[in-house]
Structure formats: C-alpha cells, structure tokens
Amino acid sequence: DSTGGGETPSRDVVFTYRPTSAAVAEAETCATAIVGGLARRAYRRPVSVGDLDQLLSFYREGAAEAGFEAGIEKALRALLASPEFLFRVERDPDGVATGTAYRITDLELASRLSFFLWSSLPDDELLDVAAADRLREPAVLETQVRRMLADPRAETLTTRFASQWLHLPNLDAMQPDSRQFPDFDDNLRQGFRRETQLLFKSILDEGRSVTDLLTADYTFVNERVAKHYGVPGI
C-alpha cells in the first residue's frame, strides 16, 4: 500500500523526493528523480531515456488514478517485473564470433562482483566506478573488492557461497546410526554447519590459504560440538 503505514525506513529509501505543491510538472520531476535512481540500481547500469519513458508511463497511469504515491508504486511494480531486474543480462559484443572469448564490460563485472560477494545489487560507488570504465583497472578493482569484503553484506559469502560450495545443506539429510551416535541431534548438526562457516570466514578474513579447510589445526566449536569432539574446558 503506497499510502498506508506512515513513514518507515523502506518508504524513506523510496520517497527521496516529494512534490510540495499540486503542480503536475513538479510531481513528475520528483517521480523522474525517484524512478531514475531506483532503476539505475535495479538495472545495474545507467538508465536510458527509453527505460525512463517506459517507467514514467506507468507512473502517470497510477498518478492519474490515485495521486503521486500511487504513481510511484505502479512504476516500481513495473520496474520489479522487468527482465532487466530479474535476470543478470550479459550481451555479446557486436562483431564477436560465436564461441569466441571476450572481455565483459565493467558494468557486467560490477554485477558479478556484487552478487558473488554480497548476493545483492551493486551499490552506488561500485556502479559509479564501473560506469566510468575504471573497474577493470587492477588497483581500482582491488580497492573495490577490499571495500566490499569489509562491508557487513559480505557475510553472505560465508553463509551462502560456502554453504553451496561445501554442500552444507546436505547435512540435513544425514542420519548417523543412532546406535553408534546416540547423542546426535539437530543442535549438533547446526553446530557442525556453523563451525564450517566460521572456519571459512576466518580463512577469508585473515587471508589464509584455502588448503586450511583441510589442514587447519584450529576450529570453532560451541559447547555441544566440543563435547562431541571430546574437547575439554568449553
């Protein structure tokens, strides 16, 4: 509901501009700024005139029916249903033969980085660098990767990527012999999963070798896992 619920953090993110009068032109200027900014994030690239015209046509329909906020809501519905938002599109460059390797654009690289490291959209800083065709520069790329890894959103690299790579969801299907492991329960299962995630995170945060996943002489345990391993004093 675009008009209910009062001010909330999510509404504040969307409604960064508001008309101060009933003038249609002022409302459309605000709508253009709002929709254009959100489309740039959602499409993960600069927004073309055609992109904006299409989205504003939905805004005008909604605004004519129920006012400014309803118009923004209708434009956002169209934005979120767009293939440009739902799919990560990488177009072959003109003149490249089928099957030939080619360098992806900086904007495509920005999307790959953000979805890999954050499982989310690129932020404004990453998009700005990519739009300026500077992201492929080694020093700039390293700076952006380090910045992204220091961001709390990089936690998803531990919880999602590590889980997928190491098939941690398969733990849910494991049912050890209850006669040999009578104390095995879901708390222990969750402890094993978190142990692996924290080990992966420590390797990433401390710049250790990936082989530490196999050779590390340390780990992370809670009381339940420590008891299972026979580790005293925890």
Functional labels for PLM-detected ranges:
Residues D1-I234:
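Low-complexity, glycine/serine/threonine/alanine-rich intrinsically disordered linker
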